[in-house]
């Protein structure tokens, strides 16, 4: 009986009883895993929920019937108030259904049911069927852009890391060469007090920006501050800056120290202002509300805690009195350190303003997409977002991926999941706020691990990923809300759908207007025959690689496999040997395809094992995806520069300097290079030709 109750509770909570393992066979989930995941989401038993006449939220598609079932008995009067204030009224009998007005506009409305002195409320969300698509894509244009990790950019003026000033300059250079966008890896808030925690996919908060990307050169108060300018002219400052700029790997600690020193001095001057800039800053703070305030409070408190003990990496390692955002001690800290909190509020305003200026540049050049942002799948355990909202995040679990052939223990990403039951109980407000924050000042949003809208692999805290299970999310409602916010922000959506993709979500994503992600290396069958360019789906973005994959040179030379062997990433020599063999077959299949579809001159070699990476081969590989039927093409500057070194190696932490490798050339020299310019001109021409073939 106990077992049956547990199974029912797990099923009711959305925990799948089994999954298909790496060998294609069903694998049952243990009772212990179910018990611990229920405990993580505070759902130990299938508790009965108090019956209300209507649910707290209902989501509908515009233009379709909108039935509302009313529980209970007796007569109810109902009042529907739209977002704009229009009201509809009526009566309904409990136990029956009625249809909401068919002409309800898209948006967020409120239904109130009244019976005697009892009231019940339901948030009514009416959404379009599909996400927004820019007119250029509706006109069947084939667009291309650069996929960039902002921190990798070198320039003659930055402070050792790519910044929003570099982004602005690169947008101009890409636009002038026919490009339609720059795609960014996540620029979410990380940790100024712990700068070496540099993964953009383990952020402190997904609602705010990484202030390390502030272009200090563009901050007026930095130039107006005599103290800052005296510091700036010191030989030691210039020497440290030049070393950070010249380094091949981002030195986060040094760069952060430089920028924080300069910005602290600039803040002193700004804080004395009584002008339109101060008014704009205060207005920004007021509009962004508690979420922004607590982000700044976290950063200020984190800085103090690290000064006292550098091992206090996040709030779980702080003294207990500071672990609860609502504690009197936290309130007291904010009052006593108001200037520090204001400083971090100002940094967020600077970052927001500079990023908005980049967006304005892209629109000035009439780039059809301009900027596309990246929404990480989760947040880190010890950051601002979990500190501010302990109820929403299940801290006794983390997300990852189930076991596969290469990783028999699976992957544990160390990110606490959002509780689907809390998201629903709050009428989807956390999801809506997240989308709104990340759809600002951009024309596209890439959703990392988009399958998370259907299900996520949850792992009990402290366990390896093979002890996990899939937990389901209300995918249809989430996709509808995604479409509504996409349309409102005029922001198209790209779903990163790599890895294990459940069949049931593929059709949902396509019909919702979410663009898929097609990586050249993966677009082949078991015979290593590569998908023809014209066979790529139109509703997709084609890329050669991603931040988790080798560059073109790295792939062709199997540098990723060699490095993986050195780092001990593979279970045994048999697996590694199989990977090398598989790569050789893939290279031959790819070379055959390049010749077959006219991406290489006929004189080029036909045997992959005898062919090294050359400018001709590099160009041919990029031509292949440029010729694709995909509406979007993402190109990596690493491949323009023929780089071999990867920027990230999945499955590693301390073994490799992830998220630090810079580009091998400055922006100025890269866009002055004849080879790069000829390549981009060729690829731009082929994209235009691909559009005409339609």
Label the predicted regions.
Residues 280, 284, 409, 497-640:
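Conserved alpha/beta catalytic core and glycan-binding cleft of carbohydrate-active enzymes
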Residues 144-148, 182-184, 371-373, 445, ...:
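Hydrophobic faces of well-ordered beta-strands that scaffold small-molecule active sites
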Residues 641-673:
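Low-complexity, glycine/alanine/valine/leucine- and proline-rich hydrophobic stretches
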Residues 149-165, 246, 335-350, 412-429, ...:
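The substrate-binding groove and active-site-proximal loops of carbohydrate-active enzymes
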Residues 351-364, 427-514:
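Active-site neighborhood of glycoside hydrolase catalytic domains
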Residues 368-430, 434-437, 456-472:
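Substrate-binding/active-site clefts of carbohydrate-active enzymes
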Residues 39-46, 56-63, 81-85, 89-95, ...:
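Acidic/aromatic-lined carbohydrate-recognition and catalytic surfaces
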Residues 198-226, 385-409, 469-479, 514-526:
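Acidic, His- and aromatic-enriched active-site or binding-groove loops in soluble protein domains
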